From Swiss-Prot:
The active site is at 215 (proton acceptor). Its EC number is 3.4.-.-. InterPro entries: Fxna-like_M28_dom (IPR048024), M28_fam (IPR045175), Peptidase_M28 (IPR007484), PFF1_C (IPR053975), PFF1_TM (IPR053976). It comes from the Eukaryota. CDD domains: M28_Fxna_like. Residues 568-617 are annotated as: Disordered. Binds 2 Zn(2+) ions per subunit. Keywords: Glycoprotein, Hydrolase, Membrane, Metal-binding, Metalloprotease, Protease, Transmembrane, Transmembrane helix, Vacuole, Zinc. It is found in: Vacuole membrane. Belongs to the peptidase M28 family. It comes from Arthroderma benhamiae (strain ATCC MYA-4681 / CBS 112371) (Trichophyton mentagrophytes). This is Vacuolar membrane protease.
């Protein structure tokens, strides 16, 4: 007996299951991704063995009481405090031991100096640097290290396996307290000293802890470490940094797969290889000490750092108040796991010929791919593995589809790409409508993508900085735009020309597009070592299998000849120009035993006899789009089924009539093959990119690239819905339309900055010591720089000068400032210099000294050929000049009011030997020392944060001409 009501299938390809299930999958994955990205795992209530979190927090508070740049007296105080803490921790560990613990050697490096250049480090012209070290080096002898103090011999060399270096710089910038840049790194390193001198945690290989000084001013401390004997011993490293102000510590970079695996064992790993590629491709312009350890020394290691929010980076909000013990524990736990793995490793992966010209004999690593899953697990594998899978997919996937297509043609079941077929007996033509919907997907994708990207240009035109404080409003707008218009266009197309092949054609188009993307990704993997395209490999793999399933579904259809014969018989009994809209009755459906298991036989199906209960509207075409949803619902109630829920539901009977034989539940398998992995990988990548870039506009970075990036990522994240989106009910798209309208209005009209997301403006005060004239300046973006400058009481409207300032289109506004009080005595005596000629006319000697400072400069209007600082070490690994000469020499001393003697060699082109002698002052811990900076901090709008422009807050100079 025929049931009067069709059985319910919760995963059928009908509007409600498609809408509910797909929405639940997206929400179930996106919400945890956002939560994991922003919430830091809590620190344990009780400190684990070997560490003391309460002690670490108190150390952080002490370290960040004042600004402590290299050129400040508070930096000396931090240096002395660190020495006391190191000795105290070592002594405490020694007293608590019942057995003999590891030897601990502390080196207060007050002898090392070095001359080097900025070539390859900064984007500016070549700059020469002379630096005197204030580093603190701690060596914990490993249980398997060779005994003796080889470093005391001038030519001493370590023996055995190489050691492990953990580095953290203890200087801050002059405008930030340095809680995360790099206070947390420093106290983490102190806790590592405590941990590895605690019984049960002694290192097998030697561990070197480097507290380096001078990173903020040019990576100077890391360069100086090259002259310390311990630099010969360390083969691997872990660099601890901060480029934000809290949150999770991220794996920024890693040199190779082998060293990354140790980090991957952390309890809460966090990061993606995308960051490494961004540095490699110069998308990220700033550098950390990692650059020196890897690029200059040839060491193998990792760069772990905080990365957001950048609005607090290098400002007075980089303090203990704006970080947390949870962030401390996140970095500390990762550092313990990574370091413990490295010092316990006894293999040969980090020893042997490195093939880098003899920098270090630390073996050869392999380029790696890595990314985390929800901050709790970590995938690490070689780039060669990714490349191999990419090539295999590029070859195998198309071949599989071709073979399947050939098989479908062979069994006469290829309905795709077929307009009609012929009845072999009569020669009559029967339409299959197999091309219907073939070009629908590119239309949907093209229009929805174009509209989403158009919003990027609109926001950039009207309110370009809105992302600075409201990145999720931008994301919501982009996602809503893409989703709503993709659904709307799909529904219009489905209303006009319903097609059961929409899914198959959509996946076929996605297959082709992702195949092209994978070709490009594979080329970059091989030729440039770019690994961040890993998501394309997974994306394509899912799409390829989903596409194959769509082709396999066609095997369940009747042969086109059998279908043609049946339609020929029906048309003889029901002549109508609109016969292609008629659907088979309930009795025309195959039974559950025959639907997909055997070929269609027209004799198996009987026509339904009309009765007084037969609907008069049966098989009638829809007449209005307004009735789109209701028509589907009413049809469902009027359709009977013989209990086979695996068949295509008949409420979509305006599609091709043969579609009733397609599997109704296949869509859910296709969706689960593509959507979850895409949401996870691209969702995490999208948030990572957003966190790294959404506030770079204040530094002159291109924000249009960010908006377009979010638009493209939004499309890629929602793309797995496109093959099914025509089945969505109107409820969620309508809700998203309201979200789109609300976020669009907000993004176009809202003020882009807030108390938590202040616009950074960079300060410097330049003083001509010969005349006493000085110019205070703020550098920032238009138009906000003008509002900030005019809010300062000392600024007079008629004396403001604003000019373009270098990279990123920022503006520099200058005005006569209040005279600073950075040194005692008349300002003309703040800098002393003497210029004398030597026997060689090409060489001139400069003697330079400054009051209450240990940083000066020589600037040349045209580059010089070479220079030499008396008493300096020169390392052949670190050239201090280049083919185009040197335009600036930076001089750093560990002693206050030092006198530098510099011999300068001019080039033949130096017909006029002109330039400046300049000294810098960076200590702003006392009020009224730099009164103009005090006024800027006090009276600038609440949405402004003041940071440094260059190494010195105050620059005092004399011009010279020889």
């Amino acid at each position: 007996m025929v049931s009067s009501r069709r059985g319910f299938n919760p995963i059928a390809f009908t509007p409600w299951p498609v809408t509910i299930l797909s929405s639940l999958v997206y929400l179930a994955l996106i919400i945890p991704i956002i939560v994991v990205h922003h919430l830091v795992p809590p620190a344990p209530k009780e400190s684990p063995a070997g560490v003391d979190l309460e002690e670490a927090w108190h150390d952080l508070q002490h370290l960040t009481r004042q600004y402590h740049p290299y050129n400040s007296h508070s930096n000396d105080e931090v240096h002395q405090w660190l020495l006391k803490r190191i000795h105290a921790i070592s002594a405490t560990s020694a007293r608590s031991e019942s057995q003999s613990g590891p030897e601990v050697f502390v080196f207060d490096d007050n002898q090392t100096n070095l001359t080097f250049s900025s070539a390859g480090v900064a984007a500016t012209a070549i700059t020469g640097v002379y630096f005197e070290s204030r580093n603190i080096v701690v060596y914990i002898r490993g249980t398997e290290d060779e005994p003796g103090e080889w470093w005391k011999s001038p030519d001493g060399e370590p023996s055995g396996k190489g050691g492990v270096l953990v580095n953290a710089h203890y200087d801050s910038v002059s405008t930030g307290y340095g809680a995360t840049d790099n206070g947390v790194g420093v106290i983490t390193t102190l806790q590592l000293l405590k941990y590895f001198t605690t019984p049960g945690h002694y290192p097998r290989k030697g561990l070197v802890l480097l507290f380096n000084n001078g990173e903020e001013d040019f990576l100077n401390g890391a360069y100086a470490y090259s002259q310390h004997p311990m630099s010969k011993f360390t083969h691997t490293f872990l660099n601890l940094e901060g480029a934000g102000a809290g949150g999770r510590a991220v794996l920024f970079r890693s040199t190779d797969t082998e060293v990354t695996r140790f980090y991957g064992k952390s309890e809460h790993p966090f990061g993606t290889v995308l960051a490494r590629d961004a540095f490699k491709l110069k998308f990220i312009r700033s550098e950390t000490d990692y650059h020196v350890f890897d690029g200059v020394f040839g060491m193998r290691g990792l760069d772990v750092a905080f990365m957001e929010p950048r609005s607090r980076y290098h400002t007075d909000q980089d303090d203990a108040r704006h970080t947390s013990i949870d962030s401390v524990w996140h970095m500390l736990s990762a550092a313990i796991t990574t370091t413990e793995g490295l010092v316990s490793y006894t293999g040969d992966a980090f020893d042997g010929d490195s093939g880098d010209g003899g920098k270090l004999n630390n073996g050869i690593g392999t380029l790696g791919v890595w990314f985390d899953f929800f901050g709790s697990s970590f995938a690490v594998f070689q780039l060669n593995t990714l490349f191999g899978h990419s090539v295999a997919l590029l070859v195998v996937a198309p071949l599989l589809l071709i073979i399947t297509s050939v098989a479908l043609f062979a069994v006469d079941k290829m309905y795709m790409f077929s307009m009609y077929t012929y009845i072999s007996e009569s020669g009559g033509q029967v339409s299959l409508y197999g091309l219907r919907g073939m070009f629908r997907f590119p239309l949907i994708l093209g229009i929805s993508t174009a509209l989403t990207i158009a919003l990027a240009f609109l926001i950039m035109k009207v309110n370009p900085f809105i992302i600075y404080s409201s990145p999720y409003a931008v994301w919501s707008m982009m996602l809503s735009t893409c989703m709503f218009f993709a659904w709307f266009i799909s529904c219009v197309a489905d209303f006009a020309r319903p097609s059961a092949l929409h899914r198959a054609y959509s996946f076929s188009w996605m297959f082709g597009i992702m195949w092209v993307f994978l070709v490009i990704a594979t080329v970059y993997q091989k030729q440039h070592g770019i690994a961040s395209s890993y998501f394309i490999v997974f994306y394509f793999a899912g799409v390829a299998v989903a596409t194959w399933i769509s082709y396999l579904e066609l095997f369940g259809l009747p042969k086109t000849q059998d279908y043609a014969r049946r339609q020929g018989r029906l048309s003889d009994r029901t002549p109508s120009s609109d016969s292609h809209f008629l659907a088979p009755s309930a009795d025309e459906l195959p039974s559950s035993s025959s639907a997909a298991g055997r070929d269609f036989n027209p004799e198996d199906v009987e026509d339904e006899e009309p009765t007084e209960s037969t609907s008069l509207l049966r098989g009638q075409q829809r007449t209005t789009f307004a009735n789109y949803a209701s028509a589907r619902g009413s049809q469902e109630s009027n359709i009977s089924n013989q209990g086979n829920n695996s068949l295509h539901p008949k409420d979509h009977r305006l599609e091709q009539k043969w579609s009733i034989y397609l599997m109704s539940s296949a869509w859910i398998l296709q969706f689960l093959l593509v959507a979850p992995i895409v949401i996870i990988l691209l969702g995490q990548l999208g948030l990572f990119l957003t966190s790294a870039t959404y506030q770079i506009g204040a530094d002159g970075g291109s924000q249009l690239v960010i908006y377009i990036g979010i638009a493209v990522l939004s499309v890629l994240i929602l793309l797995p819905l496109f093959p099914f989106i025509h089945r969505f009910t109107y409820h969620i798209p309508t809700f998203l339309l309201f979200i789109l309208i609300g976020t669009l209005v907000y993004n176009l009209t809202a003020f882009p900055f807030s108390h938590s997301n202040r616009l950074k403006l960079a300060f410097v005060q330049e003083m001509d010591l010969a005349t006493g004239n000085n110019q205070a300046s703020l550098v920032g973006v238009e138009p906000y720089i003008h509002d900030a400058v005019h809010a300062i009481p000392s600024v007079q409207d008629g004396k403001i000068s604003c000019t373009s300032h270098g990279y990123g289109g920022r503006t520099k506004c200058s005005w006569p400032g209040l005279k600073p009080k950075v040194a005692e005595g008349p300002y003309k005596d703040w800098v002393s210099y003497n210029i004398s000629k030597t026997k060689d006319d090409k060489i001139t000697r400069f003697e330079v000294s400054g009051k209450n400072t240990r940083a000066c400069k020589l600037l040349f209007d045209s580059p010089i050929a070479d220079f030499h600082v008396q008493g300096s070490v020169v390392d052949k690994r670190l050239p201090h000049t280049g083919p185009k000469g040197v335009s600036e020499i930076r001089l750093w001393s560990r002693n206050w009011e030092n006198t530098w003697t510099v011999d300068v060699e001019w080039t033949k082109k130096n017909s006029e030997r002109t330039g400046k002698v300049m000294c810098l002052w960076s200590d702003d811990n006392d009020l009224h020392v730099i009164p103009e900076l005090d006024l800027a901090r006090k009276f600038a709008p609440w949405w402004v944060a003041i940071t440094k422009l260059r190494d010195g807050l105050v620059e005092g100079s004399y011009s010279f001409k020889l």
